[in-house]
Amino acid sequence: MATISSIDSLRPLTIGLIAGETSGDILGAGLIRALKAKVPNARFVGVAGPLMQAEGCEAWYEMEELAVMGIVEVLGRLPRLLKIRKDLTTRFTELKPDVFVGIDAPDFNITLEGRLKQRGIRTIHYVSPSVWAWRQKRVFKIGKATDMVLAFLPFEKAFYDKFNVPCRFIGHTMADAMPLQPNKATARELLGILPESVCLALLPGSRHSEVEMLSADFLKTAQLLKRNIPDLHVFVPLVNAKRREQFERIKQEVAPELNVHLVDGKAREIMIASDAALLASGTAALECMLAKCPMVVGYRMKPLTFWLAKRLVKTPYVSLPNLLSGEELVKELLQEKCQPQKLADELLPLLQGSEKVGALKQTFLHLHKSIRCNADEQAAQAVLELAGK
């Protein structure tokens, strides 16, 4: 007669996963692929997007159920979100997966991870929240809720180490996806840019508030640069039709005569093709560094938001290239310093190929290598170790 333990030993490796947005779906799919390569009969179940489902993850709920942004939207959906979390707690407790992996979505996942850990289920939080930058006390909640944090960046691991929270630096999936030496000629050919053209990328952000706050200053900066470089080509990749419409309206008000190339998507190709970029901070700055494109970061927010941020944020820089290097590798012009003349003064030498550009690209390459560690594989290894496999 089979015992419970012998039945358990026959059960395939079972991994619970929750992804709450598209970026998490991409990470989840990569993790599932890497795990299936090692354990072909493994079972994956939880909240998944289309990419994770295509890799064989069984979806108890669709990812869109969790993908809500903004306080008003979250409040409107709160009863449903709480009901889903309660149901998931019950179902995962009954299933007892070998490991539960919460992918990003910290406000939803970390509480759930804590409940599952209390019930004897091993938990991983994949993608560190920015606890090193602000609301640092969250690290204690994360430490109680998880057996392991998987971090993209080395300074994140250093932060968790200070608080004795188990953390593994796995490198960044974007660094894995992008070549160490991007092909500028190919990118220019794709975009129809001549090899000898001088090219500037403007990336005023992906959120409505960013495009509203930054576009006018960015366009005025391009106008100033055109005085020095009359044949300057200006490319603006926009994430969707709404942001394009918004940017076009602002351009019509601020710089109707300025000739710019508006492109749907293709931000990465534009970064690779460009001689310099002016961008909002965020993931775009990391992507631009990996594209080996010199950049200036310009950022504005509402005065009260900035006042609060200055008091809450504990880091000397806002952009990832600077946080990775521990110095102001990339010029950051924030709030009242984010004005066209100052931005243009910083960008002009980059566009003209000053001596600084070669050294900057070498540093970008060094930083790229430091976070290019095959993150999917590293994440899979961490899951298997925690599962005792």
UniProtKB/Swiss-Prot annotation:
<comment type="pathway">
    <text>Glycolipid biosynthesis; lipid IV(A) biosynthesis; lipid IV(A) from (3R)-3-hydroxytetradecanoyl-[acyl-carrier-protein] and UDP-N-acetyl-alpha-D-glucosamine: step 5/6.</text>
</comment>
<keyword id="KW-0808">Transferase</keyword>
<dbReference type="Pfam" id="PF02684">
    <property type="entry name" value="LpxB"/>
</dbReference>
<comment type="similarity">
    <text>Belongs to the LpxB family.</text>
</comment>
<keyword id="KW-0441">Lipid A biosynthesis</keyword>
<keyword id="KW-0328">Glycosyltransferase</keyword>
<comment type="function">
    <text>Condensation of UDP-2,3-diacylglucosamine and 2,3-diacylglucosamine-1-phosphate to form lipid A disaccharide, a precursor of lipid A, a phosphorylated glycolipid that anchors the lipopolysaccharide to the outer membrane of the cell.</text>
</comment>
<dbReference type="GO" id="GO:0005543">
    <property type="term" value="F:phospholipid binding"/>
</dbReference>
<dbReference type="GO" id="GO:0016020">
    <property type="term" value="C:membrane"/>
</dbReference>
<dbReference type="GO" id="GO:0009245">
    <property type="term" value="P:lipid A biosynthetic process"/>
</dbReference>
<dbReference type="GO" id="GO:0008915">
    <property type="term" value="F:lipid-A-disaccharide synthase activity"/>
</dbReference>
<keyword id="KW-0443">Lipid metabolism</keyword>
<protein>
    <recommendedName>
        <fullName>Lipid-A-disaccharide synthase</fullName>
        <ecNumber>2.4.1.182</ecNumber>
    </recommendedName>
</protein>
<dbReference type="InterPro" id="IPR003835">
    <property type="entry name" value="Glyco_trans_19"/>
</dbReference>
<keyword id="KW-0444">Lipid biosynthesis</keyword>
